[in-house]
Amino acid sequence: MQTQGEASNPLERNIELSVSREKVEAEVGVRLKRLAPKVKVQGFRPGKVPLKIVAQQYGHQVEHEVLGELLQQQFNDAVNQENYRVAGIPGFESRNSDANGATSYEFRATFEIYPDIELGDLSSITVNKPVLQIGDAEIQKTLDILRKQRATYEPTDRPAQTGDRVTIDYRGVLDGEGFPGGQADDYSVILGNGHLLEDFESSILGMTAGQEKTFDMTFPADYPGKDVAGKKVSFTIRLNKLEAPKLPEVDGEFAKSLGVAEGDIDKMRSEIKANLQREISQRIRTKLKEQVMQSLLDKVLIQVPKVLIRQEADRLAEEMQNSRAARGFRKDQSLSGDVFLEKAERRVRLGLILSKLIDTHELSVKPEQVRSFIEEYAQGYENPEQVIKWHYASPERLKEIEPLILEDNAVSWLLDKAKIIDQSVTFDELMGYSHATNV
């Protein structure tokens, strides 16, 4: 067994492995004898099948299993001897030029290792903390949003405008041909909710029910569907149905629809304020987290195993496909992990750095943190106690929460060391959303 440090990238390693053919054959013989009493072959009584026939039928399979196990054992011994932390699954390449005449099976294992990470000095991190006071204006804006969420829709003859619900057929053509995800029938969407690309939505605005139009638009260069990203596409849209929103009045019935059983409007406003404060606190925390995470990436520079990047990119692509399917779109077969390589590299790199930070400073999860996390999460539901009981009814559910708390512990540790600068923001700035990338 030889180990080599030669590598085509800083994290790649090669190990030369040698497994004795005699050792393989001996173990194969032992296993075939153990298997023989269980083998059933027509013409022979159970347990009386000759070993030669057992070997003819199962020898190759057993040899493959034995060689694989011995090879994996040798590989494990080699990486332990070198103190390698293997990332992903190794690849094994046969090195036998004449397998029949060889006294041993020769293989080269190629794999990547996790990088050594030096965290360095993290005390110089500076973050801007959003500051927002909740007043009547913020409560009223939230009320308006809640009314829009509970709007009913009625057909209208006027031109389409933001806030309307439209039902459309659309067909997209690229170089005279259709493309995956570029067509749909009776697709309903509310204009202005961020579910459509801006150029696509702006072409619907001003249309009337029954109208059909054709227009050209260019997909963003970073659009997930690589077949159309950055390309000019021709779309034909037919507006089948146009409906205008009708907002509910702010009265006792509206309060009851928000879970205020008595229909007390003042109590409703108080609950809105409490919920709004909780959401604002979460958003502020998210903003702080984004900044300290970026600071970590800027300050701790490491190499990342390519195999981990590829795994994460493929996972993100599958996640996108499932998301499209859940919204009624057909899966885009052209969507591959290649589109997500940059995002995947960032996520993997950040995950490795966070793991090092958590281990170095022993940022373990405490039972009271789990309880606090679940209780805060449950406040967003109508029956918090039921949500809490549901989580504690399953150890697996509690286990799923631990990574979130570990990450939060890391953020808290970094914020304790960071310089925090208060920065006033508006309600719209803090609560705003970005446009989605759907067609």
Swiss-Prot record:
Residues 163-248 form the PPIase FKBP-type domain. It catalyses: [protein]-peptidylproline (omega=180) = [protein]-peptidylproline (omega=0). It is found in: Cytoplasm. The keyword Chloroplast does not apply. Disulfide bonds: none annotated. Coiled coil: none annotated. One of its GO terms (biological process) is protein transport. Keywords: Cell cycle, Cell division, Chaperone, Cytoplasm, Isomerase, Rotamase. Consists of 3 domains; the N-terminus binds the ribosome, the middle domain has PPIase activity, while the C-terminus has intrinsic chaperone activity on its own. HAMAP family: Trigger_factor_Tig (MF_00303). Belongs to the FKBP-type PPIase family. Tig subfamily. This is Trigger factor. The gene is tig.
